[in-house]
């Protein structure tokens, strides 16, 4: 196995297929990270760099593009298999507006503290704003570099070894800082005995040694929001250590303290804005879900009104009673009021869309998964986690089946004995739901998503009767053959009745929507004999005892390339277009 050689400014470079570890260093050579996860600002070391492109969170064997760049502008590109050290926490970055404000403030601070013996030259060499993060391994407070001044270039340092074990290679002796993020005590000498006031403020400006090559102490300023430490500003000098006394004057400390106060206020405001954005997102999701669930019974009401008109007219012709016109008028009023209610709900869609508009962030970290246990957000994250997938929908890591709602460990595989080509199964002790295709199989379930729902012992026939009755009326109006097979003496199950009703409504509604589409390869038009069938089947006894709900239809089924999108939030229109184009 070959290696990668990077020797300062020399022209000796050799690139091969290697297993490497990536290190990020600041402009002074201080160590910042031992992982390739996250999109970090660029850092340079001795004029030699490696630019990593499109890095989000790199796992073992993840392929990415490396560009090695030296001062002579010679470029080499190669696809290599990358193996990083255990994932470090992705930096929680503030908003773009705060970043621009902070850089302007730091530039102003640098220009306001000149060297006494060199007019026009700033006494400040570099500045960095660190954000707090808890170490998931030790539980101790660490600080992650978020904003740097001068604004770093895209240059990076790349150090590689041949070890496949993931053990970090030996660092060059010129590097003075050990791997890892900055521990709290290295930036705050008095930690944990630091405290703020009742509002945004700064702590005592102290000198800390963070670069042995310079010898001069840097200034450390803790930033507070009330009693909580929200960041640390580190200011490094551009001059060497004086023989006597400090490199910083009293005026310098006061100026740094004032800049820190401005950053503390801005950071507190940015944190509050992000928290409000998260609340806004939750409210938008809740409103969108509620609006969707309101439309389903509203549609059933309108269908009942139409059927009522037909029945009244038929009965009126048979009985010749004089009440028929009055009853028809009442049914007509029912339809009119249903239409009015539907019109009143249309502006709510606009409100939901406006609430869903987001302010762009510097970094949008991926949602935490089982393989990213080390990702930890702040108590009030500056960047909210994104998850476009509905909370009740997850994909099984073992079988690839889509699983919703319920937390039982396994799902019993069920075949389709009816006329349907697609089957959706709600299975387990009233607490599993999965989507099956013709090659259905069992898979492990994710952890429980029902922690905040009230579970109770119920009988499915009692819970589902209102739902099935509404769809019987809709099926009659649309010309769909709708049947319900119910096995006698089904056991009681522990469920959240309302949640199960809404889940079943969504699944049956989808079946009604797509059952008329022609089957693949069909030369005919819409499905002439649309059929939807509901079956309740008792599971085998044991740990999986319960009831399985099968929703079957004889429509075209779901194309394989779109099956992993059926529960994605906001994907319904795109999925509908794909289905209709596919057939």
Swiss-Prot record:
Its EC number is 2.7.13.3. Its cofactor is [3Fe-4S] cluster. Residues 414-431 have a biased composition (Low complexity). Keywords: 3Fe-4S, Chloroplast, Iron, Iron-sulfur, Kinase, Metal-binding, Phosphoprotein, Plastid, Transferase, Transit peptide. One of its GO terms (cellular component) is chloroplast stroma. It catalyses: ATP + protein L-histidine = ADP + protein N-phospho-L-histidine. Residues 447-583 form the Histidine kinase domain. One of its GO terms (biological process) is phosphorelay signal transduction system. Autophosphorylates, possibly on His-292. Residues 97-277 are annotated as: GAF. Residues 1-50 form a transit peptide. The 3Fe-4S cluster is redox-responsive, probably binds 1 cluster per monomer. It is an enzyme of class 2 (transferase). Belongs to the chloroplast sensor kinase protein family. Probably has a bipartite transit peptide. The signal to cross the ER endomembrane system is probably residues 1-31 while the transit peptide is probably residues 32-50. Sensor kinase that senses the plastoquinone (PQ) redox state involved in stoichiometry adjustment of both photosystems (e.g. long-term adaptation via transcriptional regulation of reaction center genes of photosystems I and II) and state transitions (e.g. short-term adaptation involving reversible post-translational phosphorylation of light-harvesting complex II, LHC II), thus linking photosynthesis with gene expression in chloroplasts. Reduced PQ suppresses its autophosphorylation activity. This is Chloroplast sensor kinase, chloroplastic. The gene is CSK.
